[in-house]
A protein has these predicted regions:
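Glycine-rich phosphate-binding loop of actin/hexokinase-like ATP-binding domains
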Residues: 114-165
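Glycine-rich beta-strand-to-loop/alpha-helix junction loops that act as flexible
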Residues: 72-77, 121-124, 243-253
């Protein structure tokens, strides 16, 4: 018998877990490093378990309570069939485990289980339309081939433009100076770093762009304008596809939402963790890969 419901929201940078009892009382929360399935199933599995374990400890529950937990996993890249099935073959100690995408978890939370649409712009980006009982993914195919308007994309563009500033192709920029100082003003160091960098590594530079833009840096301001244009393109396309209510989520999305107000965005009712818990508890919801 399931006594506890666990929601997990996992993206490229962080994995968060929340536990509630059958009455809906919040018992505990935990977090770990990112659990984007495309970056490695074993790695994501370990981070998911670590986040849930931290939440269990926060709740003061014994380890054997795991056998009475129903878990809803809302993880980045779960929309990819091979990642989805591989994750569900991993061993879990829980009574039940259900898996969906981080986008659908966020959508369920944003609209409290009702239909709607969301555009997440965090480390990565993904749009999802939940309409007439069906799910439609918009973008979100992974960095760098997709994920426009994301923190990873913004970080990549900042590095690209900073290298041009360093070479004298573009005018001087305080953002470019800070970035190049980080790499010891050595272009070869940038190339070596990029050979092994993951989306979260690029995304760590996104706050630097916001900081520089607030100080009036022209390059940073142009990069934020570019990011807004990318998100605007996605929002416009989703509207054309039938999305009449869209919540803009994620660290990048929420910071840029005031500049995209003409799309009549709606505020989320709940967060992605509540959406993941709702997914765990509800049978009649779309499955990514039946």
């Amino acid at each position: 018998m399931i006594e506890f419901w666990v929601g997990v929201d996992g993206g490229g940078t962080h994995t968060r877990a929340r536990i509630r009892n059958n009455a809906g009382k919040l018992l505990g929360e935990g977090r770990a490093a990112g659990s984007n399935l495309e970056l490695g199933i074993a790695l994501a599995h370990g981070h998911v378990l670590a986040a849930i374990d931290q939440a269990r400890i926060d709740a003061g529950l014994p380890r054997e309570s795991e056998q009475r937990m129903g878990v809803g996993l809302a993880l980045a890249s779960a929309e990819l069939a091979d990642c989805y099935h591989a994750m569900l073959t991993m061993p879990f100690p829980f009574a039940r485990v259900k898996l969906t995408s981080d986008a659908f978890g966020a959508c369920l939370g944003a609209f409290d289980g009702q239909e709607g649409a969301i555009l997440i712009a965090g480390t990565g980006s993904a749009g999802l339309i939940y309409r007439e009982g069906r799910l439609r993914t918009c973008s979100g195919r992974g960095f760098p081939v997709s994920d426009l308007g994301s923190g990873a994309w913004l970080g990549l563009r900042a590095i690209q433009q900073s290298l041009l500033c360093h070479d004298g192709i573009l005018p001087p920029s305080t953002l470019a100076v800070r970035l190049m100082d980080h790499f010891k003003r050595d272009q070869a160091e940038v190339v070596r770093w990029a050979a092994h960098a993951i989306p979260a590594d690029y995304g760590r530079f996104a706050p630097w762009v916001f900081d520089a833009a607030s100080d009036g840096d022209e390059l940073a301001t142009a990069l934020l304008d570019e990011t807004c244009a990318q998100l605007g393109m996605l929002l416009e396309g989703m509207t054309q596809l039938g999305a009449d209510r869209i919540a803009l989520l994620g660290g990048i999305g929420t910071r840029l939402a005031p500049r995209l107000g003409h799309f009549h965005l709606v505020a989320p009712k709940r967060d992605a963790l509540e959406g993941a818990i709702l997914f765990a508890r509800t049978e009649a919801l779309p499955c990514l890969h039946p």
